[in-house]
A protein has these predicted regions:
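A cross-family phosphate/adenosyl-ligand binding-site feature
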Residues: 1-119, 124-398
């Protein structure tokens, strides 16, 4: 994912320094080249040898080390670095970076870097909340740093509050968002619907479907990584939503319709990937229905057609994409849906095809527009999401 990218991982002298080893390992698994620079205080918490074994590269600590491969090591490293991540960052290092102090290998190197910079402060709650620290972080933001807020919880000193270094998995997501994708959706707003709706029969039971939300969340994550501001309206899902997107939770088709009406107008791209019930109980029971002998009939009524409403109420320039899950006559039914709903593209799925459908991590999609039909091969839902976004961008440029 990050092959060919050079990440400078700065590690400073806090108890959370041990988490930097897990982050370093995760970065190596993305095929990034990881260069670790430590402060001398950091070496009191974790040995440079740990990072050297993980990365295969020399861990830099001493500005005046005479064993450098390059004559001016901090400048050479700064030139080839694609992204800086300092995690954990002490209050001391935050202050030095905010005011341009360069008195060790880490601050000297980072001062020379012209690439994107991320910093994850970790410290005692009192130090974090100190106005001086907050002023320093605001200065860093002013100069283009992305400041990753600490988590709250029990700290090593025994206090409870803000100051914990976020888990390495979340820090990695920040790095991937900054580096992995072209930012061709920067400045755009994307709305995605995902998951299944649940239509109540009574306070206990409901009608739903097999949608996991994986395809919708893959679209949301891909759009986020490509620079978009993303909102996800989701029903029931079996997986967690991606980070850095706004999540709006709903249950029923009626709730999803109202949420779409509220949030769709501002979107540049709308992807309706949710599996929304076509019918809902006409009158859900107020109390739990009791089991009786014989058959049970439940009157149903049509739900609002969200995609048709979007097609009829779209604003000029908005790109609208729907999904079609079929078991027969896939192309014919999907082409008819494209025309009937007034959308730009239908992503058609054949439920009978191996590797496609609900709950799996792959998909086989046919992209249908007014101009052409494009059959995508079996691929991960993440890859399919990017293929859909590529096509949507072409449609936006028409």
């Amino acid at each position: 994912m990050l092959k060919g990218k050079v990440v400078l991982l700065g590690v400073t002298g806090g108890i959370a320094a041990y988490k930097a080893a897990s982050l370093c390992s995760a970065l190596v698994k993305t095929n990034a080249t990881v260069e670790v620079v430590m402060t001398k205080n950091a070496t009191e918490f974790i040995a440079p040898l740990t990072f050297e074994q993980l990365t295969g590269n020399k861990c830099l600590v001493d500005t005046f080390d005479r064993n450098f491969v390059h004559q001016v090591e901090h400048i050479s490293l700064a030139r080839r670095t694609d992204l800086v991540m300092i995690a954990p960052a002490t209050a001391n290092v935050c202050a030095k970076l905010a005011h341009g102090l360069a008195d060790d290998m880490l601050t000297t190197t980072v001062l020379a870097c012209k690439c994107p910079k991320l910093i994850a402060p970790a410290m005692n709650t009192g130090m974090w909340e100190n106005p001086v620290t907050q002023d320093n972080l605001q200065t860093l933001r002013h100069y283009g740093w992305e400041v990753i807020a600490p988590d709250s919880g029990r700290l090593a000193c025994g206090d409870v509050g803000a100051g914990k270094l976020p888990e390495p998995e979340l820090l990695l997501e920040h790095i991937i968002r900054a580096l992995a994708m072209p930012k061709d959706l920067a400045g755009k707003q994307v709305l995605v619907t995902a998951g299944a709706t649940c239509e109540a029969l009574d306070p206990v039971r409901f009608i739903t479907n097999h949608s996991s939300g994986k395809m919708g969340f893959a679209l949301a994550k891909a759009a986020m990584l490509r620079g978009a501001e993303v909102k996800v309206i989701c029903g029931s899902t079996t997986v967690a939503p991606p980070p850095f997107v706004e999540v709006i939770k709903v249950q029923s088709a009626a709730q999803m319709f109202e949420a779409v009406r509220e949030h769709s107008r501002e979107a540049d791209f709308v992807f309706k990937a949710a599996a929304v019930a076509d019918y809902t109980p006409a009158e859900p029971a107020a109390e739990k229905m009791k089991k009786k002998d014989g058959a049970l009939s439940i009157p149903l009524k049509r739900t609002e057609d969200i995609l048709a409403w979007l097609g009829a109420n779209r604003r000029p320039g908005q790109v609208l994409c729907g999904f079609s899950m079929e078991t027969e006559n896939v192309l014919e039914n999907s082409k008819e849906k494209l025309k009937k709903k007034g959308v730009d593209m239908i992503c058609a799925n054949d439920l009978r095809q191996a590797g496609a459908g609900f709950g799996v991590d792959t998909n086989v999609i046919t992209l249908i527009t007014a101009e052409d039909v494009r059959q995508l091969p079996l691929m991960s839902k993440e890859a399919a999401a990017n293929a859909i976004l590529d096509r949507a961008l072409i449609l936006a440029g028409k």
